[in-house]
Amino acid sequence: MIPAFPTKKISAQILFLLTLANLVLAQNVASPAAEKPTPKMTYLLVGRLFDATGDGVKENMVIAVEDERIKSVTSAADLKIPPGANVIDLSQATVLPGLIDCHTHLGSRADRYNEIYHFKDTPFSHAFAGVVNARKTLEAGFTSVRDVGSNPFLAVDLRNSINEGYLVGPRIVASGPAISITGGHGDLNNYSPYVQMMMFPEERDYKIADGADQIRHVIRGQVKYGVDVIKIISTGGVLSRGDSPGAPQYTLEELKVAAETAHMAGRKIAAHAHGTQGIKNAILAGIDSIEHASLIDDEGIRLAKEHGTYLVMDIYNDDYILNEAPKYGLPVENLDKERMVGRLQRENFRKAFQAGVKMAFGTDAGVYPHGDNAKQFFYMVKFGMTPAQAIRAATSSAADLIGRSKDVGTIEAGKFADIIAVNADPLSDVRALEHVDFVMKGGVIYKDARPSMAHAGAN
């Protein structure tokens, strides 16, 4: 028998949870800039523009922003700015589209590896973390993210609160909890059954699914509660207990049902998959993106290219897990699993990219501290990409994966004015993106840390 979704209990709990989080943290996280939107028409004087429509840079450009969208992108020589217009001087900076991270967990903290937190933390802990992490992410230059697993429906509520202007954060493409088999990477394993029954009785109703009928039921229930994207777990994981990263956890037929059900509901679907067979099963099933893809083999690379499947490979966080997570109580079992897959993942990233597989930027933020997302660019360049290719993976390619190319991902007329700037050249040193000086989202400035913050009027 398929359990019914506990609609009233969950909805009331989440509403109360987010309301409390918002009330407590509003004074601390609200951005002063968010209260002062730019005037109706604003002109950005741009020294160097990487618009992500190609790999080149345009110099001495002007971006005209009207309300929340880009009105025009023009050579400075071809545009006469009206006297007294509002002008933002970025003539000494490199300007880029707002960055996109396709694999985040906004409700997670990177200092919560000790299993004791399963018992100490409450849903409020995750809500507070989500509010803070959303702002950190935006101020790091990531104006859009895809959240692929925050329990229970935290990302949905964060998305709504940000869209309503009540909280500060990036645009969020939100999933519900990652869907898992019983005893899989998304389940709570190696505890007494009484722990599950007493402490997490509702969790199974909207994330644990065994067999085709339960998969359909859970996906439809998540769509009912407002998710933008579905996340399903195809193989074991690194940070879970009692499973192997290489082992498949859903059959090919079950994954086909998941993809069909998600697509029927107008949602894309992402699959957590480290293991070789689980990766190939997910590709053959019609899943839109493979998360991690650590142990992908040559056949998997060929299949991904043939099917146009995106790989989202989080090749930075291996360093954080091995060097920092032990301080926060990560068990030896999980460290051993990370040692098994982390280095292989990086070499397979190189092979997949060289083979021409579609790649989108995603970091697993929450495994490491939110706000450090841009540290992954260095590793993407180290393992085969040019800086321009790595940036496009986090802009135009990422926008394509999350289904938002009409609005974000490049700097072009008609798109949202999601614009960042750095006072260095990231095409020469991609680590410049670790220090974003200027962030605009939807025409509103949320960060301005340029050495010269003068907003001069036009001559």
Which residues does each PLM region occupy?
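Metal-associated gating/positioning segment near the N- to mid-region
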Residues: 93-166, 181-190, 253, 277, ...
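Divalent metal-dependent hydrolysis catalytic cores, especially in the metallo-beta-lactamase
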Residues: 129-155, 168-178, 227-240, 268, ...
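His/Asp/Glu-enriched, well-ordered alpha-helical/loop segment
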Residues: 118, 264, 268, 329-333, ...
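Histidine/acidic-residue-rich catalytic or RNA/ligand-binding cores of hydrolases
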Residues: 110-113, 155, 185, 240-242, ...
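Acidic, glycine-enriched loop/beta-strand segments at the rims
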Residues: 31-33, 49-62, 75-76, 386-391, ...
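Histidine-rich, glycine-flanked metal-binding segment
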Residues: 49, 53-96
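Active-site gating loops and adjacent loop-to-helix segments of metal-dependent hydrolytic enzymes
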Residues: 108-126, 135, 182-204, 238-252, ...
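Alpha-helix-loop-beta-strand connector modules within alpha/beta enzyme cores
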Residues: 160, 164-178, 246-271, 308, ...
